[in-house]
């Protein structure tokens, strides 16, 4: 293994900052290694990771079973288009659909969450022959042109208008607004069971159940975006299980590949059959390397039942945060280990202090919300340290 000096690391950090497109606000550190719920920077500092790759690292950084599966597959076959079947693709399809409701039995594999949502929107139009989409205020579905069209935040959308139209945005958890919006021109309603970027806001059972009923009544599809909520994050395998409904299309990504880029749109058979041959495509989607990672990730999740850990630790963590006696806290909310701490002021300075003073990595979810997405393998003692760090920066 190549040995690098601290000067080498600093040069690489500078290279990333100077040669990057500039789209991202970069932290002033270089992460070089991760294991479980911990990561280390080039100077050897250890951090508790509550960013988790924006929800990618549910199974922990460097999960040994995923690593071994990727190594083994890389030695055999890494790339093959979907027109040429491979054993690992069939294995992945079989493994994934086995843990889903029987209605969701057709898989379109891609590389990311935004691609999964792009596919879902196209399948919805192909199936219904309609154009309109209904989405939620504060909802986030991606930044490519189709998924951006059903993403609420104006700062993301407005510079790139015109986008896919028509799209009608409704207040999240407003059943009456949903009833008014969904009509005979609606192809699909797309919703997150818990809004992530929008401030970690869980749906009410009444809202999601109404979405299922209304779409069925109007002949529209229900797309559930579980890019961030899937793979055990909310205390169930998939968040829709909390609500007793099954969507027409389910989109997954982030943790699905155990750290390897992998996304899917999983749908009902009749929806899949509506897409004409060649109506959608992807070069890398379904590649054997990602398929092997996905199989290993699902099998690890199933064997360890990490969603039960999220169901246990998440409420405990939220109660500990609520017990912090700070007038700066407005609300603590979430589902499982998807947790938002809303402040009465801007969150960014406190997130920076968590990193610099306490070696805790967290992220924003809107201007005033600190979001915690730790790997589901995190130890309770680490979460206790996170609580104490939050207590200290809010003092």
UniProtKB/Swiss-Prot annotation:
The modification N6-(pyridoxal phosphate)lysine is found at residue 254. Binds 1 pyridoxal phosphate per subunit. One of its GO terms (cellular component) is cytoplasm. Pathway: Amino-acid biosynthesis; L-lysine biosynthesis via AAA pathway; L-lysine from L-alpha-aminoadipate (Thermus route): step 4/5. It catalyses: [amino-group carrier protein]-C-terminal-gamma-(L-lysyl)-L-glutamate + 2-oxoglutarate = [amino-group carrier protein]-C-terminal-N-(1-carboxy-5-oxopentan-1-yl)-L-glutamine + L-glutamate. Its cofactor is pyridoxal 5'-phosphate. Substrate binds at residues 143, 282. Belongs to the class-III pyridoxal-phosphate-dependent aminotransferase family. LysJ subfamily. PANTHER family: ACETYLORNITHINE AMINOTRANSFERASE, MITOCHONDRIAL, AMINOTRANSFERASE CLASS III. This is [LysW]-aminoadipate semialdehyde transaminase. It comes from Thermus thermophilus (strain ATCC BAA-163 / DSM 7039 / HB27). The lineage of its organism: Bacteria, Thermotogati, Deinococcota, Deinococci, Thermales.
